[in-house]
Amino acid sequence: MKEYRVYLERARSRQQDFLYPLIFREYIYGLAYSHNFNKSIFVENGGYDNKYSLLNVKRLITRMYQQNHLIISANDSNKNPFLGYNNNFYSQIISEGFAIVVEIPFFLQLSSSLEEAEIIKSYKNLRSIHSVFPFLEDKFTYLNYVSDIRIPYPIHLEILVQILRYWVKDVPFFHLLRVFLYHFCNWNCFIPTKKSISTFSKSNPRLFLFLYNFYVCEYESIFLFLRNKSYHLRLKSFSVFFERIFFYAKREHLVEVFSKDFSYTLPFFKDPNIHYVRYQGKCILASKNVPFLMNKWKYYFIHLWQCFFDVWSQPRTININQLSEHSFQLLGYFSNVRLNRSVVRSQMLENTFLIEIVSKKLDIIVPIIPLIRSLAKAKFCNVLGHPISKPVWADSSDFDIIERFLRICRNLSHYYNGSSKKKSLYRIKYILRLSCIKTLACKHKSTVRAFLKRSGSEELLEEFFTEEEEILSLIFPRDSFTLHRFHRNRIWYLDILFSNDLVNDE
């Protein structure tokens, strides 16, 4: 956070609160590189980090200074107008720079707002993607209906830029952003396709996520406003609302429209038990009351996306299901509400009664089939789940190979320790353990049995199963019953900020 303050103060000293001069500063790209280098990863994946150098950045900035966008000759028709030629590497560097620069003022506003609200200490826990599961455990057992909604895209580029302009008041910066997106990312078509969106999100992930999150934040602000207006009990949210141009004018317009055109239908939206959860590109809407209200909110979402954001969404893609009969996928987990039935014997005077008690419990399990599919894609096993060797890593030392497998196993165990049933997690550990042994045997050109007998690596490879117990023994008392109880129960780690690379949430 202090780094952002320093860089913004440098820009303010040269220009009056403008962000665009930071695009031409070398330290911005160095900051983007350090963020990518220090990011927590689960599977090693070489990117442009290995190609980064200060010399490449200097050449890039020089070309950006010298480029004249008003003069494009016929000989340059096959070249990129932004830099003179097509180069995905330079595109990724520039997009990282744009993302870093535009994030600076929001980090400063967010930090100041958190300091005023005095929630700095708990902010890291609130940032955890697993902080949503304790909320679901408390609330969803009392609800009856759920709707799993995929937030639609693509959205036109101009709408994304206009939404961002409500927050950042810097016209030259947005001119540069438009030039980059239109010419370098080939977003000059009238209606962008899903293929172009997918290509842009993979080659420029940080900038794409930043723009996409602003689109989601905009529609959620309208949804929250209408939700508060639909019931007399106002919701209190810890979210930070930043200053935006025309926001209050838009609110007044919405109030006027709803008071005139929807004065009779608005009372039907009064549902105090509706809950909304968003994760990645999906959201979950759950309610305790009849599905009629859920159906109302479904069509509200569809009309909101179509009328305000020009995004087409089909009503049949949003299904309303009974929570006790439907399982939904959330952050790599399968979740549903399970009914537990128990019989209690009650005696009154000389009469004995059998009373059946039904209780609800949120069941969260590891989806073994999608996870095995992800492991097979990463070449740790085949499609049937049989472990195979990893010949690509055979050039590394034995210690590095074991450490790589242990890191992946540790991260998966850390991520899926909130599962209700640990059997699937043990199977994943078993696949990684045998894949590690086969990789070491392949390196030494030996069979698995001969390698284990010769090297005696069984004790070292036991770390795949014993490490989690050692961590729990440091947290809880060294009582076998206590450790066994916590080993069976769910434990949510609130230091997880990113989704695991092997998690398939499709």
Swiss-Prot record:
Query: What is this protein's gene name?
Result: matK
* Protein name in the entry: Maturase K
Organism per entry:
Trifolium microcephalum (Small-head clover)
Query: Quick one: where is this thing mainly located?
Result: plastid
For this entry, list what GO says about its biological process.
mRNA processing; RNA splicing; tRNA processing
Keyword tRNA processing set for record: yes
The record's similarity note reads: Belongs to the intron maturase 2 family. MatK subfamily.
InterPro entries, alphabetically? Domain_X, Maturase_MatK, Maturase_MatK_N
For this UniProt record, the keywords arranged alphabetically read as follows: Chloroplast, mRNA processing, Plastid, RNA-binding, tRNA processing
Nucleotide-binding found in the keyword field: no
Which GO molecular function, any one, fits this protein according to its record? RNA binding
Q: Say what the protein does.
A: Usually encoded in the trnK tRNA gene intron. Probably assists in splicing its own and other chloroplast group II introns.
- Lineage: superkingdom: Eukaryota
Q: Where in the cell is it found?
A: Plastid, Chloroplast
One GO CC annotation, please? chloroplast
